[in-house]
């Protein structure tokens, strides 16, 4: 398992959560995960965004939990194999934010 799949240190966790919250992510109240909702102009934009994220997720072998209705995409990130938030989630969240900004 790569070092990116490992738990965050307490200091890393504090800093990355501040950064992620500043960009609209929130902590899941029920699990050690992060969540964000994205709204696009239409279904085509939402699906294009999801396609970009899916390709990156497959490349990382780290797949989001997500839900899509028309122009809305809801994403939860958690490392199931580790039982919580890891560096992989942070890296994918950062990619997701960049992908959403480019739509």
Curated annotation (Swiss-Prot):
Tissue: Highest level found in the kidney, liver, heart and ovarian follicles.
GO molecular function: 4-alpha-hydroxytetrahydrobiopterin dehydratase activity
Leader peptide range in chain numbering: none
EC number: 4.2.1.96
Top-level lineage group: Eukaryota
UniProt entry keywords in alphabetical sequence: Lyase, Tetrahydrobiopterin biosynthesis
Enzyme class: lyase
Single GO BP term: tetrahydrobiopterin biosynthetic process
Keyword Transcription in annotation: no
Record's catalysed reaction(s): (4aS,6R)-4a-hydroxy-L-erythro-5,6,7,8-tetrahydrobiopterin = (6R)-L-erythro-6,7-dihydrobiopterin + H2O
HAMAP family: Pterin_4_alpha (MF_00434)
Family that this chain belongs to: Belongs to the pterin-4-alpha-carbinolamine dehydratase family.
NCBIfam families in UniProt: PRK00823.1-3
Function: Involved in tetrahydrobiopterin biosynthesis. Seems to both prevent the formation of 7-pterins and accelerate the formation of quinonoid-BH2.
Name of the molecule in the record: Pterin-4-alpha-carbinolamine dehydratase 2
């Amino acid at each position: 398992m790569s070092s990116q799949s490992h738990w965050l240190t307490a200091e890393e966790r504090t800093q990355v959560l501040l950064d992620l919250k500043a960009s609209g992510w929130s902590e899941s109240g029920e699990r050690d995960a992060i969540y964000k909702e994205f709204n696009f102009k239409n279904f085509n934009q939402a699906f294009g965004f999801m396609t970009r994220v899916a390709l990156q997720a497959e490349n990382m072998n780290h797949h989001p939990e997500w839900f899509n209705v028309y122009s809305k995409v809801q994403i939860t990130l958690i490392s199931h194999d580790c039982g919580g938030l890891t560096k992989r989630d942070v890296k994918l969240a950062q990619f997701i934010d960049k992908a959403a900004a480019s739509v």
